[in-house]
């Protein structure tokens, strides 16, 4: 849809591109993913042979706001207001409202959860000036990021390296597998994507992390494909060979 708006020329190539994008956009049956209108929530999965057997509802607060925005704005298969209110917002239960490190968190779990929740929807949706009955989303993403940063600076578990220039908890590889790191699930592993993808929200803090990652950790963290996925300075583990494209 971003490309559809950008390529606005009258020539045949751009006109065809817009037509193809429009066809794809209008073909998505968002309302089907409410179990064909029987429930007031969208579901993550459906397949021709297993149907909705995975039975996983999409509910906030997390990275999936963009799904509900696209579904609500569909010109052909929109969801109703009640699906957004009861499904995504859980009837208001996605609100938080408590303070962590002197910062109010409008939505989500305590301490905000993993930082990718502030990133994915807003690759294509501007949170500035975006609000609904539940939150101002610019306040949400900025405060979530500030809490994640403050937690790493506080470093209550005493992990090596954590601080004002080395921070950011989000899903990544860890030495013994994979986990969704957050202040409530802290395994001592920093993921560069967490701080760097938060540049619009915490420009000074994110730039400090960028300088540390690049100039201080250098080749331990940087490769031909950019920064590696994650690292643990307590054990000296670096996830060499693994990258994530965000």
Language model regions located:
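Ser/Thr/Asn(+Pro)-rich, low-complexity disordered segments
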Residues: 1-245
């Amino acid at each position: 849809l971003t490309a559809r708006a950008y390529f606005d020329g009258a020539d045949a190539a751009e006109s065809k591109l817009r037509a193809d994008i429009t066809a794809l956009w209008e073909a998505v049956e968002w309302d089907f993913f409410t179990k064909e209108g029987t429930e007031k929530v969208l579901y993550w999965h459906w397949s021709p042979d297993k149907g909705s057997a995975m039975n996983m509802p999409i509910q906030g607060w997390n990275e999936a706001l963009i799904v509900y925005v696209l579904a609500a704005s569909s010109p052909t298969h929109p969801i109703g207001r009640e699906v957004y209110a009861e499904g995504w917002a859980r009837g208001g239960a996605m609100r938080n409202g408590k303070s962590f490190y002197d910062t109010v968190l409008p939505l989500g779990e305590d301490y905000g959860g993993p930082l990718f929740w502030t990133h994915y929807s807003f690759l294509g949706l501007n949170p500035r000036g975006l609000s609904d009955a539940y939150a101002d989303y610019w306040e949400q993403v900025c405060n979530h990021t500030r809490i994640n940063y403050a937690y790493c600076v506080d470093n209550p578990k005493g992990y090596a390296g954590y601080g004002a220039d080395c921070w950011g908890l989000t899903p990544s590889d860890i030495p013994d597998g994979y986990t969704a790191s957050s202040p409530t699930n802290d395994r001592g592993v920093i993921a560069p994507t967490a701080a760097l993808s938060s540049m619009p929200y915490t420009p000074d803090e994110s730039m400090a992390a960028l300088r540390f990652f690049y100039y201080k950790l250098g080749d331990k963290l940087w490769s031909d494909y950019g920064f590696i996925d994650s690292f643990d300075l307590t054990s000296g583990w670096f996830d060499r060979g693994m990258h994530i494209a965000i």
